[in-house]
Amino acid sequence: MMMAAEEGVETPEIGFYEYGKPYFIQPAGWYFSLSHSGEYAACALARKPVGVDIQKIRPVDLGVPRRSFSEEEQQKLRLSNSPEEELIRIWTLKEAVVKASGLGLRQDLRCVNASTGSYKTWKLEDYIVSVYCADACELQDQIKRIFYK
């Protein structure tokens, strides 16, 4: 709401792209992404397409990488001292990238990577959070973490 007020818009107006990704009709020129897991929710706002994902670190099926991860990502997973945490880290980044694209999981996830944009991943208690901004926006310098419980 503060962002809308700064843009001179009383109430934000939201629309949906073809594949269901929400976007701001007003205030124009802003992008957002939402995610939740367990007791946390995450929101990302940017002037470029943006995606965010948060996932709780938990036991996972280590067979997932063969279907969804590139060979390079699978190698990182094999070499990791904490494969479940690394799997969640890679997965949240992939989710953030596909959310920013607006295409969702309709893409071959083995081909999804963050090399054409900016991203930041961090650990919050037992959760991994990844934010991805398309077009290599200045994410690293602008990201602000605000957590409330």
Spans of features found by a protein language model:
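Core catalytic alpha/beta fold that binds nucleotide/phospho-ligands
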Residues: 1-149
